[in-house]
């Protein structure tokens, strides 16, 4: 029999990628990079095919040195995962005993809770205000059994963000025994001058880890590469239990190439910065409530009127070949999340939703 509670965990459900009767739907359901991947990363991936019979470097030293160089970090304070999801799970394994708890926002990313519950930990959901993490509510949830506080900044699936000042205030209010996990999967898309990526806080504090991913702005979601930066006393136990060959040779090579492809990153960021406000404005004009976003997607809240609901909107768009994400499993039953697409895709989504809303 599995451990108590394992079969009570709701498995992670990703964005839909197929729709019956439509051969090639437009996928705007998983916050992938709509531009694809860096050509330099693709070349690096192809150049690695002659080494498929070789185990990868378990310490990912080539990638480690590249990330350290790019972000001016100490290489010994880095860990690498099969996506940043694996790092979240490893943190839970390192820090949680049965009955311990994690704290996250009420609309927080599902992987945090899955990792905690797999370790027989409890999950405390802090109330959010306007889909935004409220640091006072987070602090209220912390008690003597709290071991980890997970904050995605910007957040998924809402797109909201906290300023550097707010993150520092939250950290200052936490007991030293609680590790603050700052998930920066979408950090590259945030242009707010008051936003901070958390790396400096992780450099100076004893209980902060920042995680990043190559899945979003770098367009390498299929390769599953994430990294974390923290004090060595946090990294060391993760390294003790981390699977030994968890990032493949092609993944490491492609990630290094992507990391230094500034042109691809700039184009990816520019597309989002151009079409995110446009899409938000257009959806607002249809009578939908759009949450301010600093990520590569927008969250739109629909009426509860039969025929105009979020699940019905998701189904309508799918019937026309456009896949978006209803987020009822994130305690947002009236909302859908839409990845920023190419111009023609964004315009098509607005036109279809205009039809759906009867405008």
Swiss-Prot record:
Pathway: Amino-acid biosynthesis; L-histidine biosynthesis; L-histidine from 5-phospho-alpha-D-ribose 1-diphosphate: step 7/9. It is an enzyme of class 2 (transferase). It catalyses: L-histidinol phosphate + 2-oxoglutarate = 3-(imidazol-4-yl)-2-oxopropyl phosphate + L-glutamate. Its EC number is 2.6.1.9. GO terms for molecular function: histidinol-phosphate transaminase activity; pyridoxal phosphate binding. Its cofactor is pyridoxal 5'-phosphate. Keywords: Amino-acid biosynthesis, Aminotransferase, Histidine biosynthesis, Pyridoxal phosphate, Transferase. It comes from the Bacteria. PANTHER family: HISTIDINOL-PHOSPHATE AMINOTRANSFERASE (PTHR43643:SF3), HISTIDINOL-PHOSPHATE AMINOTRANSFERASE 2 (PTHR43643). This is Histidinol-phosphate aminotransferase 1. It comes from Caulobacter vibrioides (strain ATCC 19089 / CIP 103742 / CB 15) (Caulobacter crescentus). The lineage of its organism: Bacteria, Pseudomonadati, Pseudomonadota, Alphaproteobacteria, Caulobacterales. The gene is hisC1.
């Amino acid at each position: 029999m599995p451990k108590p509670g394992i079969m009570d965990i709701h498995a992670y459900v990703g964005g839909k990628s197929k729709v019956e009767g439509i051969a090639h739907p437009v996928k705007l359901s998983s916050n992938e990079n709509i531009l694809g991947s860096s050509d330099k990363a693709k070349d690096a991936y192809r150049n690695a095919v002659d080494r498929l019979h070789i185990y990868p470097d378990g310490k990912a030293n080539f990638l480690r040195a590249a990330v350290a160089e790019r972000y001016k970090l100490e290489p010994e304070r880095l860990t690498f995962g099969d996506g940043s999801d694996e790092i979240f799970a490893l943190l839970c394994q390192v820090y949680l005993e049965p009955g311990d708890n994690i704290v996250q926002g009420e609309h927080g990313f599902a992987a945090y809770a899955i990792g905690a519950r797999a370790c027989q930990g409890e999950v405390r959901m802090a109330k959010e205000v306007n889909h935004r993490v409220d640091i006072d509510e987070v602090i209220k949830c912390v008690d003597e059994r709290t071991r980890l506080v997970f904050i995605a900044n910007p957040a998924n699936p809402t797109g909201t963000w906290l300023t550097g000042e707010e993150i520092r205030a939250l950290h200052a209010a936490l007991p030293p025994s609680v590790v603050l996990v700052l998930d920066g999967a979408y950090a590259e898309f945030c242009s707010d001058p008051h936003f901070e990526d958390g790396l400096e806080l992780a450099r100076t504090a004893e209980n902060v880890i920042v995680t990043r991913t190559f899945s979003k702005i770098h367009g390498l979601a299929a390769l599953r590469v994430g990294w974390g930066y923290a004090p060595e006393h946090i990294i060391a136990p993760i390294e003790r239990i981390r699977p030994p060959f968890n990032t493949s040779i092609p993944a490491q090579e492609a990630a290094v190439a992507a990391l230094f492809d500034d042109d691809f990153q700039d184009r990816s960021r520019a597309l989002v910065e151009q079409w995110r406000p446009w899409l938000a404005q257009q959806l607002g004009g249809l009578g939908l409530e759009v949450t301010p976003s600093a990520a590569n997607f927008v969250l739109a809240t629909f009426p509860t009127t039969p025929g105009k609901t979020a699940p019905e909107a998701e189904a309508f768009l799918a019937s026309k070949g456009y896949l978006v994400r209803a987020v009822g499993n994130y305690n947002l039953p009236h909302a859908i999340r839409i990845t920023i697409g190419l111009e023609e895709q964004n315009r098509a989504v607005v036109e279809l939703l205009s039809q759906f809303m009867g405008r």
